[in-house]
């Protein structure tokens, strides 16, 4: 692969990390800083590069694979000259003045089978039959706070246990405010990717990327929530947080959770868990992907995806948390989330 001399020059500030065999990932979320992942941990590092430098890296790296990268084509999955995989996100899919470059460094070494036990935690590999018992143990920890009526401890446990939470209520009911509160309880070392159509969420975590999709496919470089989800899965997220649920974002939400990224915190319109779930079901079913699924299949997917539905309402100057639907509570009653459709 012929390497542009300018690209080689622009990559100099990160060559030390790229050449280090301990490096697994380099995440550049904005000018001036990078997060380098080694031994499974991201460490924040200073990076003397400007916005223009990052944009040039993106354009030149895309050109290596004959991909036109820019405002009209702001997403690109490509490779660097050394074979490192690169996910590019440029404005308008990220806020103006920022660029997201996520570099995954391939391992140059192939491990033998005799190293499996030292490289992997395989303590549960033959424990399929005990998975229900483990589920019950996990449920008990959450249910203890639920049954004790300790809302603060319950919400904290939901967040740190990576339960997928759906907040429902009418406009102005406090659901977005609560989502910001819950996000602040996510452990600070986690890498967060948000997918929104407007910048509503507040993310206090250092290592985060804000991804933006266009409403109704309008605007320059218009991308869908589904496009952003596909990109985010190549960006080593600990959690993917979807903003308000609407249109094709609902399918992206479901795809995100079932792809192995639980712990999302999202909002949807609906006065109570029944209406909130029916709204989610309707949104997913109205998507191109959801329309091709049988109702039973879709309900089963949602049953594995949604752990908590929290309703909100406001009256006068009071914000109220209503009756929470909890999957663990439903399981002990012999119910599933699908039963909400029949109420």
From Swiss-Prot:
One of its GO terms (cellular component) is cytoplasm. Autophosphorylated. GO terms for biological process: secretion by the type IV secretion system. The keyword ATP-binding applies. Keywords: ATP-binding, Crown gall tumor, Cytoplasm, Nucleotide-binding, Phosphoprotein, Plasmid, Transport. Its main location: cytoplasm. It holds the Pfam family T2SSE. It is found in: Cytoplasm. InterPro entries: P-loop_NTPase, T2SS/T4SS_dom, T4SS_GSP_E_ATPase, VirB11. It comes from the Bacteria. Belongs to the GSP E family. Required for the transfer of T-DNA to plants. Couples energy, by means of ATP hydrolysis, to T-DNA transport. This is Protein VirB11. The lineage of its organism: Bacteria, Pseudomonadati, Pseudomonadota, Alphaproteobacteria, Hyphomicrobiales.
């Amino acid at each position: 692969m012929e390497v542009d001399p300018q690209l080689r020059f622009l990559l100099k500030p990160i060559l030390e990390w790229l050449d280090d065999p301990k490096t697994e990932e380099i995440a550049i979320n904005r000018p001036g800083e990078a997060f380098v992942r080694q031994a499974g941990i991201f460490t924040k590092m200073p990076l003397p590069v400007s916005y223009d430098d990052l944009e040039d890296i993106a354009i030149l790296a895309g050109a290596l694979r004959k991909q036109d990268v820019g405002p009209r084509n702001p997403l690109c999955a490509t490779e660097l000259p050394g074979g490192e995989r690169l996910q590019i996100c440029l404005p308008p899919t990220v806020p103006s003045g920022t660029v997201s470059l996520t570099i995954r460094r391939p391992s140059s070494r192939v491990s033998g089978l005799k190293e499996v036990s030292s490289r992997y935690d395989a303590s549960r590999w033959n424990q399929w039959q005990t998975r229900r018992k483990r589920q019950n143990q996990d449920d008990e920890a959450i249910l203890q706070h639920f049954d004790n009526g300790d809302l603060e401890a319950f919400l904290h446990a939901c967040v740190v246990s990576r339960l997928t939470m759906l907040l429902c209520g009418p406009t102005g009911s406090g659901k977005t405010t609560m989502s910001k509160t819950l996000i602040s309880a996510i452990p600070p070392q986690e890498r967060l990717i948000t997918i929104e159509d407007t910048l509503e969420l507040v993310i206090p975590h250092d290592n985060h990327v804000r991804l933006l999709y266009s409403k109704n496919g309008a605007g320059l470089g218009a991308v869908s929530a589904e496009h952003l989800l596909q990109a985010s899965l190549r960006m080593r997220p600990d959690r993917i947080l979807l903003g308000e649920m609407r249109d094709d974002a609902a399918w992206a939400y479901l795809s995100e959770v079932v792809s192995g990224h639980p712990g999302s915190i999202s909002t949807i319109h609906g006065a109570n868990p029944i209406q909130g779930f029916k709204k989610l079901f309707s949104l997913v079913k109205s998507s191109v992907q959801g329309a091709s699924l049988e109702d039973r299949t879709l309900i089963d997917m949602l049953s594995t995806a949604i752990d908590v539905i929290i309703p909100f309402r406001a009256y006068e100057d009071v914000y109220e948390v209503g009756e929470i639907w909890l999957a663990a509570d439903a399981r002990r009653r012999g119910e599933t989330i699908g039963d909400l459709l029949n109420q």
